[in-house]
């Protein structure tokens, strides 16, 4: 008989029939029964049980007449692997079986069933019906054997409307009883309640021991594998996302804790008058935080612009950021929710919360920082007031550096975009709101130095160098706007060579734009004694003269853009102009149809400029556009057969293309 039984069960139904039969009348020894149950457990771990099978096994587990001993029943509970979403009625049945006296079901079995319920909580088909039994579960908190499991279930189920005044009083009274002061399970529930009403549950509570039940990861993994096989169209990530969706929110709902006939909850408002009355009665910081969920209330808050509201909001933020977000391991999603809310708040808010300043620094000490939360935090940082102490700015940028140095160039590129946005916000500040100009310039200097350090760390990557040039362009625009005569931060020489030696005009033009801004800043201040800028611009011109003959027409165009603002620096331009103009094979190779006339028009204009300023100055030994270069242009344009017709048609062509200044200059030359 035993050799036949050792072959195992053909299917789940056969196993359940055998279990029911032997629970009423044992047909074998306990050792044989245990071996058969282990075979059944192995089968269940492979195929799982449907709701009907789970319900049938619960009949055996909860039966007072069963002949199975405690070990057999506990093994049966481990067999409850679901292969589909579990109905809430099964969970309600387990809660209904709880017996404070342990007569219907022993405390050990009740604890095992509650533990199973925690393990399958994310596989329930909902929790709306289960929430109706919240009070029943809360009643069993006083039972030491069941408390770890009851507390965990309550933490999972708790919503804002569950946190009532009487429950807060009962929970705190239970925690203060002798022997319960260090209870981690009660503390976990207290901290959950504190998230919803930090203004009611005051004081600090810290863990000595983590107050959660240890989950059997292998059992959960086996369950997920079964569910995945049973339902190919539902990926495993569905279960984890469902779990995250049920995670309690740190942001209170739009309700008041107590409502009377003369007051309204924020959800019940129907008129502006009612909204005004409710605002006047807002007392608790958590209610201020709840207001942030509604754009209408948020705008109303800014219109009221009362300091008492901002101070209460800051108080809620202090508790939420320093206590709520550190409550459990899954707090990254809660943190993302809070940071999203704060980002929307700061888009309109005239005031930056003080508690957020400290949290920004402590954020980087977290062991697991998600990229989404990091991006949100950096966006918040761009709203930090410029009146904030410079030492804080310096500390913040140091934290950024340590964090980014562990990443790659792509991550650094995203960070430089944030720095650009930060400087752009500073540029768009009204002059009156800029406060102390020296403070603003000090912040800009810190940001540009920080960006330069990061780009140099990543070996002057081309894309990063381009972003750095954009940062310096904003920096010089800010300097020009506030008209503050200072010795500015000069871009490093490495930036010159990295961008000028690129084959793309995109990078060269960014460098030219920066060079023009530095010159403009010098001219706006009307102070040529700023040696730093003079040295800076001359170093660029020297670099340009070194590489321009190695380039094609892109470098020539850059040269021409710089001609007019820097024509007084003839010592830098004269060698380049002479070389380009007299090297016709080179000119034919690099000149475009618009570049060549533009270049020669500037050369002629420069000669006129020299004659006017210093008549003793000789002319540049220059060969003008003549028939020698006509062949190269004619092959491109196919406009005329004669040099005279070519000149006329070429002027018409330039006008069509919008080069009016060049065409007018050439036309005046022809007329002469």
UniProtKB/Swiss-Prot annotation:
It is found in: Nucleus; Chromosome, Centromere. Belongs to the CENP-I/CTF3 family. Keywords: Cell cycle, Cell division, Centromere, Chromosome, Mitosis, Nucleus. The keyword ATP-binding does not apply. Its main location: nucleus. PANTHER family: CENTROMERE PROTEIN I. GO terms for biological process: cell division; CENP-A containing chromatin assembly; mitotic sister chromatid segregation. Component of the kinetochore, a multiprotein complex that assembles on centromeric DNA and attaches chromosomes to spindle microtubules, mediating chromosome segregation and sister chromatid segregation during meiosis and mitosis. Component of the inner kinetochore constitutive centromere-associated network (CCAN), which serves as a structural platform for outer kinetochore assembly. Required for the localization of cnp1 to the centromere. The keyword Cell division applies. One of its GO terms (cellular component) is chromosome, centromeric core domain. This is Inner kinetochore subunit mis6. InterPro entries: CENP-I. Component of the inner kinetochore constitutive centromere-associated network (CCAN) (also known as central kinetochore Sim4 complex in fission yeast), which is composed of at least cnl2, cnp3, cnp20, fta1, fta2, fta3, fta4, fta6, fta7, mal2, mhf1, mhf2, mis6, mis15, mis17, sim4 and wip1. Interacts with cnp1, sim4, mis15 and mis17. It comes from Schizosaccharomyces pombe (strain 972 / ATCC 24843).
């Amino acid at each position: 008989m035993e050799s036949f039984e050792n072959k195992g069960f053909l299917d789940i139904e056969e196993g359940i029939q055998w279990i029911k039969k032997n629970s009423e009348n044992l047909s074998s020894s306990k050792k044989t029964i245990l071996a058969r149950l282990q075979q059944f457990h192995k089968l269940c771990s492979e195929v799982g049980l449907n709701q009907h099978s789970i319900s049938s096994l619960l009949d055996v587990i909860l039966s007072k007449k069963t002949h199975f001993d405690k070990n057999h029943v506990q093994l049966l509970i481990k067999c409850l692997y679901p292969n589909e979403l579990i109905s809430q009625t099964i969970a309600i049945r387990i809660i209904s079986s709880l017996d404070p006296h342990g007569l219907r079901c022993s405390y050990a079995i009740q604890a095992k069933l509650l533990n199973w319920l925690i393990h399958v909580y994310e596989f329930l088909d909902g929790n709306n019906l289960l929430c109706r039994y919240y009070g029943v579960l809360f009643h069993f908190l006083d039972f030491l054997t069941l408390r770890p499991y009851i507390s965990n279930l309550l933490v999972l189920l708790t919503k804002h409307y569950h946190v009532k005044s009487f429950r807060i009083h009962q929970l705190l009274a239970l925690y203060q009883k002798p022997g319960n002061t260090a209870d981690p399970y009660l503390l976990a529930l207290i901290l959950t309640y504190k998230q919803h009403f930090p203004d009611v549950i005051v004081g600090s509570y810290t863990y000595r021991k983590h107050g959660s039940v240890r989950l059997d990861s292998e059992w959960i993994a086996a369950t997920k594998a079964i569910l995945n096989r049973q339902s190919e169209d539902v990926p495993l990530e569905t279960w984890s996302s469902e779990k995250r969706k049920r995670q309690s929110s740190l942001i209170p709902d739009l309700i008041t804790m107590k409502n009377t006939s003369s007051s309204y909850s924020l959800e019940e408002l129907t008129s502006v008058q009612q909204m005004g009355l409710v605002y006047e009665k807002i007392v608790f910081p958590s209610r201020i935080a709840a207001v942030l969920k509604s754009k209408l209330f948020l705008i109303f808050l800014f219109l009221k612009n009362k300091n008492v509201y901002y101070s209460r909001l800051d108080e809620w933020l202090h508790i939420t950021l320093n206590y709520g977000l550190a409550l459990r391991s899954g707090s990254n999603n809660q943190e993302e929710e809070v940071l999203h809310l704060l980002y929307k708040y700061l888009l309109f808010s005239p005031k930056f919360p003080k508690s957020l300043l400290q949290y920004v620094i402590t954020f980087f000490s977290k062991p697991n920082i998600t990229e989404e939360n990091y991006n949100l935090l950096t966006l918040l940082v761009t709203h930090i007031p410029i009146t904030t102490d410079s030492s804080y700015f310096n500390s913040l940028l140091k934290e950024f550096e340590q964090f980014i140095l562990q990443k790659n160039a792509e991550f650094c590129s995203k960070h430089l975009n944030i720095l650009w946005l930060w400087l752009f916000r500073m540029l768009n500040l009204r002059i009156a709101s800029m406060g102390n100009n020296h403070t603003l310039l000090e912040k800009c200097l810190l940001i540009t130095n920080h960006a330069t350090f990061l780009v140099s760390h990543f070996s002057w990557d081309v894309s990063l160098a381009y972003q750095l040039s954009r940062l310096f362009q904003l920096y010089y625009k800010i300097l020009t706007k506030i008209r503050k005569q200072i010795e500015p931060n000069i871009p490093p020489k490495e930036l010159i060579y990295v961008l000028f030696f690129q084959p793309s005009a995109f990078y060269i033009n960014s460098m030219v734009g920066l060079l023009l801004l530095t010159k403009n800043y010098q001219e706006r201040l009307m102070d040529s004694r700023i040696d730093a800028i003079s040295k800076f611009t001359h170093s660029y011109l020297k670099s340009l003269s070194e590489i321009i003959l190695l380039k094609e027409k892109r470098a020539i165009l850059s040269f021409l853009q710089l001609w007019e603002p820097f024509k007084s620096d003839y010592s830098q331009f004269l060698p380049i102009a002479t070389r380009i103009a007299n090297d016709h094979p080179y000119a034919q190779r690099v000149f475009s149809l618009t570049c060549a006339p533009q270049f020669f028009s500037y050369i002629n204009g420069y000669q006129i400029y020299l004659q006017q300023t210093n008549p003793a100055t000789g002319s540049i030994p220059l060969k003008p556009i003549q028939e020698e270069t006509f062949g190269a242009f004619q092959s491109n344009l196919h406009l005329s057969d004669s040099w005279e017709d070519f000149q006329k048609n070429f002027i018409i062509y330039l006008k069509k293309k919008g080069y009016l200044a060049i065409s007018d200059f050439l036309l005046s030359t022809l007329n002469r």
